[in-house]
Amino acid sequence: YWSVTRFADIMEVEANWQSFSSDPAITIIDPEEDFPLPMFIAMDPPKHDEQRMTVQGSVAPKNLKNMESTIRGRVQKVLDSLPVGEPFNWVDKVSIELTTQMLATLFDFPFEDRSKLTRWSDVATGGPETGIVESEEQRQEELLECLAYFTNLWEERAKQGLSNDLISMLAHGEATQDMSPQEYLGNLILLIV
C-alpha cells in the first residue's frame, strides 16, 4: 500500500509504473482469487493506456455536446418530478436516478432496465457484510447476470458499426475486442461504478 499526495511525487509515480504498479489491484484489500475482475484501472501501461483510450471517446467534449439536449431533457424531467413543499430523499430521487440515466445513455443501455445498473454497482462494491447481498455466492451470481446481460449487448453491437456508446467502443476496440469475459465484466464494473 502506498499513498502519494504531493504533485512532484505523483508525477514520479506516474512515470515509474514499474515500481508503483497498479496490477493486480488498486485497493488495500487483495483481489479475489476465485472471482478475479481485471479492469484497466488496475493495469499498467501499455495495456491500461490502450484500454482506457478505447472508451475515453464516449465522454469526449464532442460526444458530450451531441448528448447535451438528451442530458438537459432528462435533468429537467427529474427535477420537474420532485415534490414541492414536502420532504423527499434527494439521493434516491435525484442523485441515483440522474446518474443511472446518464450511465444508460453512455452505454446505450435499455432505458427501461436502467435500475439494473444501480443494483450491479451496489453488488460490485458491497459484500455480504454490507447487507446488499446475503453471501459471496449471491454476489458472484448477480455479477454473472450482469455479464450475461452485457454480453448480449456486446454481441449486438459487435455486429453493428462502431458507435459512440461504451459497449460499442469495447466491442470494436483493438485493445478490448478480445477480452476474456472476466475482464469484460471487470471493465464494465469499473465504468458503472
Model-derived features: positions:
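Central I-helix of cytochrome P450 enzymes
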Residues: I96, A104, C146-L147, G173-V193
